[in-house]
Structures are given as structure tokens and as C-alpha cells.
């Protein structure tokens, strides 16, 4: 078959018409230095602060310093294979992490990837790790409690849903134990929890996960891990990732709880990154924006209005308010709460629970210092029975500590003073509680009623704990309906008062 010149030219024209040119442009730059996980990039333009930068092998860095000619970025993960001269690209995206119900019961890293060996997580929703806190109009007042299960805290330092309550104290004073017990106590009401481990040993994190699993609380918890062996960039990122995961529940009309363990190590990781980025150091070598580091994180914990939930879900969920309650943990050195990071976080949060080494070592656990522990908004959220019956506990303890200090110098004490000292000792003993043994509202209510109405007068200090154990067993065996009724609505009235008196008298006569 022979083709003439006309047919050949026609074929060429058709091919030219069908030819498509793919014109794809990239915002590309070159790495000019690599230093302890910090890369300097030359040649990138129009970079956003916090933008993801694509590195070889599908790894990412985040732009934190934007200078005239160069970009300072922190690598999210290992950086040994990254060399000078490597080409990198802008993505035009701010870092996002996967969120949703599918993450409950899983252990993930700061980027949201599973690290528990249970396979991949099916999710289709991503949220940015950095988000604006809800405005004043979008918020609701706090009027519902988060029960920690600890008598000392639910009575004296109550926590409301949407509150930020700091747990502060020296190492080995029970800070993590308190937070873990609070998570365990939420399993009864299926309240989603997020536990963020920052800069901790892997052995410690494994123990925490094991305890959550043993008490059936892991299925309701997302564990976000940035251990001490991981890059400072991932330790810096972890709390923001965990917060985004918690906000998913808040913005869908649910209540959620998040624990940051701990923000002292978070501040140290940020200090390391800032110094490597050549930012000017300030007090204790922390950068000038270390307050903003924690304020923008903790302000995202809030109780949001029905309108906010409706707007975020585009009308799919209506008539529901949501909340995210934050329990940040700060470790102090020798009880110094006036250090830079502790004072910052105290001023940001809505109160603090101060755990003291001396109390812990003397066997008072939880080692709550009632004098400087405070909840600024939680009292409005207390259940009626706890609010009514625990009002005199803090006063009694304050008087006891004052008299105990005075009695060391006085040789003889009058009858009234002796009585107050013994009552204070009994209250101190009553507030002691073992780990992983959170108490329900009805159990706390009954014990506070006994203390408030002088039913402890004929019981010695040594027998308080045994008495508590026996009367609670008796209450569940013979007055189960009463205990369940109180757990359900948290009310206290004359009928319940009469039933409590009857229960106590029957127990003492048995």
C-alpha cells in the first residue's frame, strides 16, 4: 500500500491536533543546610507558615521560619538520609491528621499513623492540626461535670465539661495516675478520650496502655504517642494532633476529654526547635512565644453552642452542644510553681490541682494540696448531691491544718480543739483513695453525708478505710435501687436524706 503526499500531510495534521502538552509547574527549592532535623531551603516562594514541604521518599517538613531568601523547616521524622542539594517542593497544604470514631482504641503517632500493629485505620476525614479556638459567641457556659472518681477532687476541685484544669506537681506524685483514673471513670458513660504522651519513655507509655486495656477503657480512648526517642518535631506536634482528634467529637455535639502528658516536655521540645532555628532565646532559654505555644492549644478546649455544632456539621446535627475538656500536666522541680512554664500554664487554665511530694510520701493519695488547688468554673458544674454534702470539706481541712501546726507548740489543748483535730484527721483519712478505684456519685455522696452528719464520731481514724469498704458493700447489697437512682440524676432531697440515715443506722446495728 502506497501513501501519497496529501494523505501523509493529513495524518501529520491529525496527530498534531491530538497532541496534548501537559504543563505542570512546581514551587521547587533546594536544601542548602541540614542541622539536627532543621533544614534550610533556598528558592521556595509563596510559602505559608506551617505549610507542609514534600521531601524525597514521601516524607514531610513543616515551614516554621520564613526569611527573605530562605525557609527554615523542621523535618517530621528521621533526617539522616536528607542531604544538601536535595530538591524539595511546596504542597500548598497545612498539616492535617486523620480524625474520627475509627481511631478510638488505637495507638497512633503524632501524624496519625497507627503504631499498634493492628493494621491500617479506615478514615476519610482529615482536620488541620492548627485551628482557631471558638470565639466568645460560639461558646456556652460550663454547667455539666466531668467526674474524676476521686472524692478529694470531685468535692474540692470539681471539673466541668469544657474546662481546662491543670494537674501540676513534682515527678512521682501521681499526676499521670490521676489523669488515667479520670479516663477509666469515663468508660461508664462512653465519653471519648484522647491521651497524648509527650517525651515519655516507651516503657511508661506501654504500662499506661496496658492499664487502660485492663480496665476496658482503651476502646474509648485514642492514644497519641511522641516518645522521648522520637524527633523533637514530633513531640512538638503531638498535642496539636491530639487536640484535632478531640475537636472532631466536640464539633459533632459530643463531650470529649483530652490529657496532655506533659506540657513541660512539650515546651522543652519547642525550645530545642527554636534554638536550632536561631530564634532569640529569652527567660530560661525559651523563645518569646512559648506562652502562645500553650495558649493557642488550651484555648481550643471549650464548650461550644448548638449553633456552632450546626454550622460545622452543615445542619446534619442540631440541638446539641459539644465540649472538649483538657487536663494538661506540668512537672515542677522541687515544688517550684513560680518557674516560667508552670506560671504560664497556670495563667492560661481555669484552675489547677497541685499534688505535693510531702503528702504523697506520708501516704495521703491523691496528694492534693487543698490550699492552693482551685477550680475557677467547676463549682457551677457540680452535681447537686456532691455540692450540697461536700461544702464543709475544704473548710474542715483548712482548719485542721492550721490547728495541727499550732498544736505542735501548745502543751495542752481544750476539748473543742481536740475534737476539730480528730475530725480533720478522719476527713483526711476519708479522702484517701487507691489507684484504679474511681468512685461513683452515689458512693461519694454517701461518704460525704456520713462525714457531714457526724456519723464518724464513734469510728476511730484507723478504721475509717475499713468502715468505708464495708458500708459501700452493704449499700450495694441492700440499697441498690437508691445507689442507682443517685448515679442517674445526682439529686439530693429529704427523701434521699431519710434513706441515707436509715441505711447507716441499719448498717451500724447489723
From Swiss-Prot:
Protein name: ATP synthase subunit alpha
GO CC entries: plasma membrane; proton-transporting ATP synthase complex
Catalytically driven reaction(s): ATP + H2O + 4 H(+)(in) = ADP + phosphate + 5 H(+)(out)
Disulphide bridges, residue numbers: none
Membrane topology designation: Peripheral membrane protein
Any one GO MF annotation of this record: proton-transporting ATP synthase activity, rotational mechanism
Family (UniProt): Belongs to the ATPase alpha/beta chains family.
Cell location: Cell membrane
